[in-house]
Amino acid sequence: MSYKLEKEAFVSNLTGSSSIETCGLLLIGIACNVLWVNMTARNILPKGNLGFLVEFFIFCLIPLFVIYVSSKVGVFTLCIASFLPSFVLHVISPINWDVLRRKPGCCLTKKNENTFDRRIAGVTFYRSQMMLVTVTCILAVDFTLFPRRYAKVETWGTSLMDLGVGSFMFSSGTVAGRKNDIKKPNAFKNVLWNSFILLILGFARMFLTKSINYQEHVSEYGMHWNFFFTLGFMALGVFFFRRSLKKVSYFNLATFITLLHHCLLVLTPFQKWALSAPRTNILAQNREGIASLPGYIAIYFYGMYTGSVVLADRPLMYTRAESWKRFQRLLFPLCILLVLYLVSNFLSVGVSRRLANTPYVANVAFINMFFLTIYILIDAYLFPSSVPYGSRVPKLLEDANNNGLLVFLIANVLTGVVNLSFDTLHSSNAKGLTIMTMYLFIICYMAHWLAQHGIRFRL
């Protein structure tokens, strides 16, 4: 077997893990968040380059290490261990908020109320940590140090990486939910331009991978399709539904698309075609990408709904009461998503990222909506409302959040470079961890460099 086929086989025919274990892994991100807050509250976090390295250790290396050792130690044991440093700090050291309150711009006055930073730290934590988990996994999966149960499943089941794909869509929708630019005269032109850029990226990736004979997992999206094509066509689909059904809420719209897609899969030969049709024409060659598109559009709308609840009508001071009010508004949608998932299981409809079917959409939307609210509540309950946004968010995470698409692009390019330069399949765990550390450091440094130079790329 050639090395290319060996690498393709390494990520094929996998069955995944459980949603419970995946949530356990995501709790590690919460633990890292709490640790950073505890260090910040006690003014023991270094400044400058050393501070950047400490944040890199907390938010990149701890999750990487947890993923690696989780094949030997239970995930929930690791969760408990991850919260221990914060507990120790809480016991032995007092909190000092005065240093953070004294930072310039932290006090709300009539003079600065129009420019007071209304960004919500919990949203930044959620979006940036989801992005860092995603970019960690896309390279780590090519090393043997990455447990196979966290890699993308072949057809039925779920895993950490399966969640990561949907989470990218949900996270993108979250920040789009606060906007209401559908009525603007140039709205369609903007959507076309954004889609064009994403499709160009998709074609560039396709031609590059074909020209260098790069390994491909065909059953993931198809022979030519890739994630950038999904993003490009999704933007057009979202615009079409928003323009056609203006008065329907984002949540109802997402549920309608999910159920319509489910009926199409179950009541017609569409599911059979998507999973087993001979690849005799351009559509059949890319059947997975086409079949999963409605599901990803639905996930995006669920993200938009969540963003419209969390980010709309923000007060000048985001208090505990405001956070709790947002959480209460999301309780009913969370219950609906949970029911959708449980009913799907009861009817023996398997979770499938390959199809982006109802249980997959419900699972992704529920987990993301739930963890986003947890991040927001943690921020509100651990920080006094008088502490400014700039003191509530690590610079590393803010930089990653501000340039999410560029960070994702850089990660894709670096993943290709590493795979072409190293025999990842036969690398020792020590070598794999070293390469992963350098890879993550370059990504974080590039995000920091882009922020320092005011470069921000948004679609």
UniProtKB/Swiss-Prot annotation:
- Listed GO biological process terms: GPI anchor biosynthetic process; meiotic cell cycle
Which GO molecular function terms does the record list? Answer: glucosaminyl-phosphatidylinositol O-acyltransferase activity
- Where does the protein end up? Endoplasmic reticulum membrane
Keywords for this entry?
Acyltransferase, Endoplasmic reticulum, Glycoprotein, GPI-anchor biosynthesis, Meiosis, Membrane, Transferase, Transmembrane, Transmembrane helix
Transmembrane segments in this chain: where?
20-40, 50-70, 73-93, 120-140, 156-176, 188-208, 221-241, 250-270, 290-310, 331-351, 364-384, 405-425, 432-452
The set of disulfide-linked cysteines is none
Q: Which EC main class describes this enzyme? A: transferase
One GO CC term on file:
endoplasmic reticulum membrane
Q: Which InterPro entries match?
A: PIGW/GWT1
Where does the record say carbohydrate is attached? N13
Pfam families xrefs: GWT1
**Membrane topology, from the record:** Multi-pass membrane protein
Physiological role: Probable acetyltransferase, which acetylates the inositol ring of phosphatidylinositol during biosynthesis of GPI-anchor. Has a role in meiosis.
The family note in this entry says:
Belongs to the PIGW family.
* Protein name (database record): GPI-anchored wall transfer protein 1
Source organism per UniProt: Schizosaccharomyces pombe (strain 972 / ATCC 24843)
Q: Which gene encodes it?
A: gwt1
